[in-house]
Amino acid sequence: MMYRFELPTPLAYFASLVQSDEHFPLLEAAASLAQDDYPDLDVQQVLGDVDQLMARLKRRLADDAAPLQRLRTLNQFFFRDLGFSGNVNNFYDPENSYLNSVLRTRKGIPISLAVLWIELAQGVGLNARGINFPGHFMVKVNLPKGQVVIDPFTGQSLSREELSERLEPFQRRGGLVDDFEVPIGLYLQAAEPRDVIARILRNLKEVHQSQADWVRLVAVLDRLVVLLPQAWSEYRDRGVAHEEQG
C-alpha cells in the first residue's frame, strides 16, 4: 500500500501556529506570512538563517556580559554591522513585511525589523518585547536600571520626551489632551505575539486595498480571520474583497 503525504496549505500551516497564546511562535508565524507570495518558501530555512545570525551575535558576547553590554552589542551587530534599516524609499512595498525578503535586503518596516531584533535580543538573554505604539511599532528592553525604548526603523533609543512628541498628534486626533490626557506608560505596554502578527497583516491589508489587489487582499483576510476569529469586521471586509475579485 502506498501512503501519500501531503504538506499542509500555507493557511493550514499558519492556523496550526496561531492556535495557542501560551505557545505562540512569533518568529515562525511572521515568517510564514510570506508563503502567500512565495508558496514554495521553506520557513524552516528562514528560521535557520536567523539562528545563524544568533550564533554570530553570541560569539561576540562573554557569558557574564551585563544586560546593558548585551544591548549595545546587539544594536551594533544588527544596525551597523548587518546594516538592517528602514526602507525609506519604498515603505509600502509588501516585501517589507516578509521576513525572508527583509533578511535578504536588510530593509524593512518597523514591525518586521522588530520581530527579528526581538528574536535576537531574547536569544542573548534580554527581556525584550514589542510595543504597539500608535503609528510606529517600537521595541523595549527592561534593564536593571530602567527601561529602554528603541525605534527599530533607525536603531535610535528614545527618551520619554521624544516619545511624547511622537504621541501628541495621535492624542490630539483622539481628543486625548489636557484633562483627558492618557499617561504615556499605557502606550508602552508589551504587545502580545498575536497582536504583533495582526498588525503586520493589517499593514498588508492596507497596502493591498490601496492597490486594489483583491487576490492578495483575500489571502491576507483569510489569515486575519484565522488569527482573530472574533474580529467580525475582517469577515465583512473579506466578503467585500471577494465581491470585488469577482
PLM features per residue range, with description:
Residues 1-246:
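A structural boundary/capping signal
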